[in-house]
A protein has these predicted regions:
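Transmembrane and membrane-interface helices of multi-pass
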Residues: 2-208
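Solvent-exposed soluble domains appended to multi-pass membrane proteins
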Residues: 228-576
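Membrane-interface segments at or immediately adjacent to transmembrane helices
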Residues: 172-250
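Short, hydrophobic/amphipathic alpha-helical patches that form generic packing surfaces
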Residues: 68, 89, 211, 313, ...
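Generic detector of well-ordered alpha-helical segments enriched in charged/polar residues
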Residues: 52-56, 115-119, 132-136, 197-198, ...
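Membrane-interface junctions
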Residues: 7, 73, 121-124, 215, ...
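General structural signal for secondary-structure boundaries
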Residues: 99-111, 120-128, 195, 207, ...
Length: 576
């Protein structure tokens, strides 16, 4: 036995390294098999449902260990292969902590996104769990220095390892069939992906790689079936053309997209301090339309997905980013294009660099006339929200009227840092992350108040519609209250002031409903593209859905919209 371990230490050690790394990859979202079995009380979990997915993990580890069968002298090749995978796991774990899903492989090529904000975020997320994946590799390298070259393996061993891996995947496939029942084909779990982390846990990491490669190289074409499904959905959409909720005068349209704003921060006092008093004052003003129960519908593109939803009324992809994969040479119907028909000029202003999330190319696809990033106002460092908002006032004043200004904040992006001048908000009985987030939004609120004052002093505010919308959620209400999360904790916000309507929408809706609502308020209902949502002024919303199947309400058309949007984007429907 001892001699067998010595002869096979590289193969065995490599296999163990990948088992641990794969376990750490699965743990953040769904909970790894070994993690659950070691940390949970027996009887508190379904043993079979927990154990069977482990066969898929072992199959993955066997496939990933295959290089160890062909290496003898150059063991560093195997060590480098393991280290590379461990680095991948560490990055994915940090991504999962924020986005609750695995990062698509295409995002690893987005070097333009690497900036100070991203590096600070990564530093705040890196913890002991990310280091655990590397520990078996360190032990393997240390032990390997004292042992002779590993044995040479023949074809039979290679075939045996591959056979064991296939057996593990077969167990996983059988489990999927029994779990899903007769309503799904045996291939459905492998050809349809709602969440990447779920695909990895259910089907395996190696099948996930195969799926990602196949979908990346398969050309996207709009089939006749795609067109029928799209047009069937659109035929059932409301087709109103009146502008009953718009001012007869053409007002400037100013949209402030607030980074990571959860609606629970509005109309809330913590430790005697009103978190966002300036924005709160808008909620209770005549001419304000407010919806504070918007289900966040962003996915892998996060902020860029939010911008895409708000400007087009389309939903993002359930895997991948529209901004990085489907913005080049595209022309989407949008707010900017709807307003341009009525003589509006437009610009998009952001705090970071144009290359981050491919923002400039997305802005072109959305029809903006001008795009300003941090290089327009500085040497290339990210702008503060305060500096961006002040620059925006000058740009609005200098633009031909009417103007559509799309302004994107950044400083409330996590990780939240200790404030230079803390208020009583820092004394909240909650994790530091929550306290620092409250302080960050309190500061941003003051900057938004200053922005509105500057518009007022220059005679611009009284002739403008100002919309404040969330790009997505981040610090959910359960984190403040110290309890298990619910969907209600994630709600985002839309506040539009300067309109001829006063209305508060108290029922849940989706981010996809922002676009048709803004069309309604801006008097652009002659524009043929109304989006996949519904104007919140036309009827009380009944439902909202997320791509993982989460449904609020009973209208399943909101789930269907995800499939329709995917077909529109991937098939380049608007190029017809």
């Amino acid at each position: 036995m001892k001699q067998a371990l010595k002869n096979n230490y590289l193969l065995i050690g490599t296999f163990v390294c990948f088992v641990v790394a794969l376990e750490m990859l699965r743990a953040p979202v769904y909970g790894g098999t070994l993690t659950v079995m070691l940390t949970c009380v027996p009887g508190s979990y379904d043993f079979v449902d927990t154990l069977l997915p482990m066969f898929v993990m072992l199959a993955d580890a066997a496939v990933l260990s295959l290089p160890a069968l062909f290496v003898r002298r150059r063991r560093w090749i195997v060590y480098a292969w393991i280290a590379l995978f461990c680095c991948y796991v560490a990055v994915e774990r940090m991504y999962m902590h924020v986005y609750h899903d695995a990062m698509p492989f295409s995002h690893f090529l987005l070097w333009g996104n690497v900036n100070g904000t991203l590096l600070r975020s990564a530093g705040g997320l890196f913890g002991a769990g990310e280091l655990v994946a590397f520990l078996p590799l360190i032990v393997l390298i240390f032990v390997g220095r004292k042992l002779p070259e590993p044995r040479r393996y023949g074809r039979g061993t290679v075939l045996s390892v591959i056979g064991c891996a296939l057996a593990g995947y077969a167990v996983g496939a059988a489990y999927n069939v029994s779990r899903l029942g007769r309503n799904y084909s045996i291939t459905q779990p492998y050809t349809t992906m709602y969440k990447a982390c779920g695909y990895i846990c259910d089907n395996g990491f190696v099948p996930y790689v195969v799926y990602s490669v196949v979908t990346a190289v398969t050309p996207d074409r709009l089939s006749d079936d795609d067109r029928r499904r799209i047009e069937s959905y659109l035929a059932r959409q409301p087709r109103y053309t009146d502008n009953s909720y718009a001012s007869p005068q053409r007002r400037n349209v100013i949209v402030i997209v607030v980074e990571s704003l959860n609606s629970w921060m509005l109309d809330r006092t913590v430790c005697g301090v009103e978190v966002m008093p300036h924005v709160d004052s808008l909620l209770h003003r005549e001419g304000t339309v407010a919806a504070l129960k918007l289900l966040p519908q962003v996915k892998d593109g996060r902020s860029s997905d939010g911008h895409f939803i708000i400007n087009t009324g389309l939903l993002p992809l359930s895997s991948g980013s529209v901004a990085t994969s489907y913005a080049h040479n595209r022309r989407y119907p949008s707010l900017a294009r709807a307003l341009k028909r009525h003589g509006y000029t437009s610009f998009n202003m952001v705090c970071d660099q144009a290359s981050a999330w491919n923002q400039q190319e997305l802005a072109q696809a959305l029809g903006f006339d001008r795009f300003y990033d941090c290089t327009a106002q500085s040497t290339g460092d990210d702008l503060s929200d305060e500096a961006m908002l002040r620059a925006a006032v000058d740009s609005i004043a200098a633009s031909p009227k009417p103007v559509f200004a799309h302004l994107v904040t950044l400083n409330t992006h996590q990780p939240y840092r200790a404030p230079d001048s803390p208020t009583a908000l820092s004394r909240v009985d909650a994790p530091r992350r929550v306290a620092y987030a409250l302080e960050a939004f309190h500061r941003l609120d003051a900057q938004i108040g200053d922005f509105l004052d500057r518009l007022r002093r220059r005679g611009l505010l009284e002739n403008s519609i100002v919309a404040i919308v969330s790009d997505h959620n981040d610090v959910d209400l359960n984190e403040l209250e110290g309890r298990e999360p619910t969907v209600d904790d994630t709600y985002c916000a839309m506040i539009v002031t300067g309109t001829v309507v006063t209305k508060s929408i108290d029922t849940p809706a989706g981010q996809v409903d922002i676009y048709p609502t803004l069309l309604d308020l801006a008097g652009c209902n002659d524009y043929s593209w109304k989006g996949l949502g519904s104007s919140l002024l036309r009827r009380e919303p009944a439902s909202a859905a997320y791509c993982d199947g989460t449904l609020i309400g009973a209208d399943r058309r909101t789930l269907e919209a995800w499939d329709v949007s995917r077909r529109i984007i991937k098939g380049n429907y608007f190029a017809k």
